[in-house]
From Swiss-Prot:
Family in the record: Belongs to the inorganic carbon transporter (TC 9.A.2) DabA family.
Gene Ontology cellular-component annotations: plasma membrane
Top-level taxon of the source organism: Bacteria
Cofactors demanded by this protein: Zn(2+)
Disulfide bonds: none
UniProt cross-references to InterPro entries, sorted A to Z: DabA
Residues engaged in binding Zn(2+): 424, 426, 606, 621
Gene name tied to this protein: dabA
Subunit composition and interactions: Forms a complex with DabB.
Keywords recorded for this protein, A-Z: Cell membrane, Membrane, Metal-binding, Transport, Zinc
A family per Pfam: DabA
Entry protein name: Probable inorganic carbon transporter subunit DabA
Broad class of the protein's primary localization: membrane
A GO MF label: zinc ion binding
Length: 901
């Protein structure tokens, strides 16, 4: 039992190196380093480079591109270098330091000739003996790597590649439940037991190896310990050894990690995977592991050679000149080279890039207002701050009605604004919001796209239920969509007819004899479809939509807003009346919309439309787990229109005028249109006028927004008809880049709309409304930081990782991807499950960057004490900031910016 508990703990701790990977159909952005954020970004970068040869700093080409485009100010970088040198004193002639810095900052590689020079070997040997003990300790972690990594096979590749191929084969077979007609036998027992059953008959193993498999224990944990003991791995090194195996195929391991979280019967899936992988490694390595020695000394030697060569090359000191110095001087030179290595300068370039962007954001905000303090309405607020942040802070208003919790009806109607439209914080909404506000008396608001509703949706036109909230939060309620019984019966029959046609086609395609006949039967139709879709993508798509609407028209539906008893549901169905009031109140507070309501309030989720795109979910709402957020918008709008909810809100201090009507829509990000999801049958005269006004200007808004967006796509020149061109991109099945998605995302601004209104933030900023004056205890800010900001940071780091290390964290070229097992994509027919973004999602061309890989800048509009209180109360966020996984800046009421590093 003690051993099993130990193995469980080892695996639980080792999971930190991978991230749960959801199926591609419900793709949700994940921070690949979430489990490693207890360490600094720089330490994780060094560790990944050491153990997997993965560099997560922007490379030389990306840095040069940023400088050329004006995104990176070299003077900022030079100042960082100067500051770094002033922190240390080196007893080295200044001209050598200057030469070294001038050369290494270009990030040039050291030529191989320097490494191979005999004098470099002499210097390395000279230093090695004195430092051998220290270096052996430093390089100990290198030796806790999979045995198969250290053994080279006859083809000249590590034996771990053979292990990987075996694991890809078996993992694909286990996971595939949708594409194959036959699934893995005995998979219901467990992955490990199904593999034991089949592997005994797998002739890719020798007869002796198959006998070993047959004799394995039934308990995967016992198998894991047996293999670790066989390889003489010390118990304190178990975790590092297991981490090495998880990082070998982080995509497949991440998919199993995700499934282990979703289903109780698969909770030990990673244990099964590791047991199988370790057995396969043992079988393939055989007795060769005995020849694998702990080569700390050779690694130390190699490190010294690299460092000596770096000093000689960057300082322009020939190795024979270096040898003329005494040992102590040589040690000083090499210590300097080790301290000032190339990755230190890569990190400085990254910081300079981020500081340049931070400065540009400041300038945009300042330039957007003649007086920032005036734009922030500071005359309305008199803030008394005590030096002790723990003491109370009072807020007094010149107009006391502005935040009076017992608001009267008089101050609730905004007669100057026709409509208020609340958009998801998604960066793609920023340009759209800007164009809407420029088109008329419309106000826009930013809030996370799930609108604070922790729900699982059960829509009539979707095969599976979907958790419509951020992936790090489990749903607490289920909301069902339903319609009139007769209409539903007709719709279900139509669905079954369509499903049976597709099922029959799939059945014929996946079976031997019928598949021979299928080309003859389907060839003419599919050929015609191919031609039409290729030549006229927009028209063919529109025609298909018309046919679908005619033959499979979704009936008018309602939602189970009120609590219902459903014994088949594992979640409560619907809300109680008090829960409806609470969620409505919370959402309105998060939108900073508790007074001055316009006659027409639109809650706008967002969705993306593309054709033949396995990654379509990556373009959907990240706050809704990779799905459109119109469902959540409709639900909240319906709740806010209920008289009993409004009465409850009034008792809580929020009065919504009777003339104010809530509606729901979806912002289609691939075409920049606004599609109505829910508009009440009865509108007040003012609401109707606002509704019609918004519809009247929407074509112009779409044209302007599409033109701005299409100008950024690399394959488009001047566009005369931007709306039609955007529709073509969304319909073209050959288009690898229907839209840029969230590429170039760089900042998250939390504050009142006046702070950024009218400012062109280039579609790079998440915008969330917030007024610190109405958040006395910091609860709202903490909610925004813990939810929307966390989602945005995950999105940001996934784009970052897919750009700086596409071979490890990206998903490669879309043109060569293969959808596998119904869960993800591979490159070719046997690779790791590619869990990041495709090359086309972050690059404009093979050598032209589009996404700028910088860490998220979070800007909070609030006094310093509010931010300090947040950092004190939210350790998780404070750790992200202090360990450099994001950058934090604040702006106070006087317009003073402060960086929190």
């Amino acid at each position: 039992m003690t051993t099993q508990l130990n193995i469980n703990l080892v695996i639980e701790n080792a999971k930190r190196v991978i991230t749960p990977l959801s199926p591609i159909s419900i793709f949700a952005a994940r921070n690949p380093w979430e489990g490693l954020e207890a360490d600094t970004f720089e330490d994780v970068a060094k560790w990944l480079r050491d153990v997997r040869d993965v560099d997560i700093f922007p490379n030389k080409a990306l840095i040069e591109s940023a400088v050329a485009r004006g995104e990176l100010d070299e003077s900022v970088f030079n100042q960082l270098v100067t500051d770094m040198l002033l922190e240390h004193h080196y007893n080295i002639p200044q001209h050598y330091i200057n030469l070294y810095i001038d050369n290494i900052k270009t990030l040039k590689d050291v030529p191989a000739s320097y490494m191979n020079h005999s004098n470099v070997d002499v210097v390395a040997d000279l230093l090695l003996e004195k430092s051998k003990r220290d270096m052996a300790e430093s390089y100990h972690h290198y030796d806790v790597r999979p045995m198969s990594d250290a053994i080279i096979d006859e083809q000249g590749e590590p034996l771990s590649e053979q292990v990987n191929r075996q694991m890809i084969k078996w993992t694909k077979l286990y996971i595939d439940q949708f594409l194959s007609s036959w699934t893995m036998p005995k998979r219901e027992q467990s992955f490990y037991h199904a593999w034991l059953h089949l592997a005994q008959h797998d002739h890719s193993f020798t007869k002796a190896q198959r006998q070993v498999i047959k004799d394995l224990p039934n308990d995967p944990k016992m198998t894991i310990e047996s293999v670790l003991n066989h390889f003489s791995i010390a118990q304190e090194d178990y975790q590092a050894y297991v981490e090495g195996h998880l990082l070998a195929l982080p995509g497949w391991a991440g998919m199993l990690y995700y499934r282990s979280q979703q289903h109780h019967f698969e909770q030990h899936l990673l244990t099964d995977y590791l047991a199988i992988r370790l057995v396969v490694e043992q079988l393939l390595v055989g007795d060769e592991f005995k020849s694998v020695t702990k080569d700390c000394e050779s690694r130390s030697e190699n490190w010294f050679k690299q460092t000596v060569a770096s000093w000689c090359y960057y300082s322009d000191m020939p190795s024979d000149v270096l040898l003329q110095h005494d040992v102590n001087e040589i040690q000083t030179f090499i210590h300097f080279a080790a301290t000032m290595n190339k990755n230190v300068f890569k990190n400085l370039w990254l910081i300079a890039w981020e500081m340049t962007y931070e400065s540009q954001v400041k300038q945009k905000i300042k330039a957007g207002h003649e007086s920032l303090a005036g734009a922030l309405d500071v005359n309305q607020v008199n803030v008394t701050e005590n030096d002790n942040a723990n003491q109370s802070h009072s807020v007094s208003l010149n107009d006391t009605q502005a935040v009076d919790e017992n608001n009267s009806e008089l101050n609730q109607v905004d007669t100057s604004t026709k409509a208020q439209i609340a958009f998801c914080i998604d960066v793609r909404s920023e340009p759209f919001r800007r164009h809407i506000e420029a088109a008329g008396p419309f106000e826009t608001i930013g809030i996370a796209g799930f609108f604070g509703l922790p729900i699982q949706k059960d829509a009539v036109d979707e095969q599976f239920k979907h958790d419509s909230l951020p992936v790090m939060v489990p749903p607490a309620y289920r909301i069902k969509e339903f319609a009139d019984r007769y209409d539903m019966n007709v719709y279900r029959q139509q669905q079954q007819t369509m499903s049976s046609m597709f099922y029959t086609f799939k059945l014929m395609k996946n079976n031997v004899m019928p598949s021979l006949l299928l080309p003859e039967l389907s060839g003419p139709f599919l050929s015609l479809s191919t031609i039409v879709n290729t030549i006229m993508p927009r028209k063919s798509r529109a025609s298909l939509q018309k046919i679908k609407q005619k033959w499979l028209k979704k009936p008018e539906t309602k939602l189970t807003i009120d609590r219902e008893f459903d014994r088949t549901s594992d979640l409560p169905v619907g809300f109680t009346e008090q829960e409806q009031i609470d969620f409505a109140l919370q959402a309105l507070k998060l939108m900073d919309l508790t007074e001055a309501f316009a006659p027409f309030v639109v809650l706008a989720g967002h969705a993306s439309h593309s054709h033949n795109n396995p990654h379509h979910a990556s373009l959907e709402c990240g706050a809704c787990g990779g799905a459109s957020s119109g469902f959540n918008a409709k639900l909240l709008a319906m709740i806010c229109n209920r008289p009993n909810v409004r009465q409850g809100l009034k008792q809580a201090g929020v009065y919504i005028p009777e003339t104010t009507v809530f509606a729901a829509a979806e912002h289609h990000t691939s075409t920049d249109t606004l599609a109505w999801v829910y508009v009440p049958d009865t509108l007040s005269a003012l609401a109707l006028d606002a509704y019609e006004s918004l519809n009247d200007v929407m074509p112009m808004i779409s044209e302007h927004a599409n033109r701005e967006r299409l100008d950024k796509l690399p394959t488009i020149g001047r566009v005369n008809h931007p709306v039609e061109e955007a529709q073509r991109f969304a319909s073209d099945w050959s288009e690898v880049r229907p839209e840029w998605g969230l590429a170039k995302n760089a900042s998250f601004i939390i504050g009142r709309r006046q702070l950024t209104k009218g400012i062109d933030l280039e579609g790079r900023t998440f915008l969330h409304n917030y007024d610190w004056r109405k958040d006395k205890d910091g609860t709202l800010l903490n909610t925004i930081i813990s939810g929307p900001v966390l989602v945005a940071q995950w999105i940001n780091l996934q784009y970052y990782a897919s750009t700086v290390a596409p071979h490890f964290y990206g998903s490669g070229n879309k043109a060569t991807q293969t959808v596998t097992s119904g869960v993800g994509v591979m490159q070719g027919n046997a690779s790791d499950l590619m869990y990041g973004l495709s090359w086309q999602s972050v690059m404009a061309a093979d050598r032209t960057m589009y996404h700028s890989p910088i860490r998220l800048l979070v800007v909070i509009q609030a006094p310093d004490y509010v931010v300090a209180r947040l950092l004190a109360n939210n350790e998780h966020f404070a750790r992200k900031a202090s360990n450099h996984w994001l950058r934090l800046m604040s702006v106070n009421e006087e317009g003073r910016f402060k960086s929190w590093i």
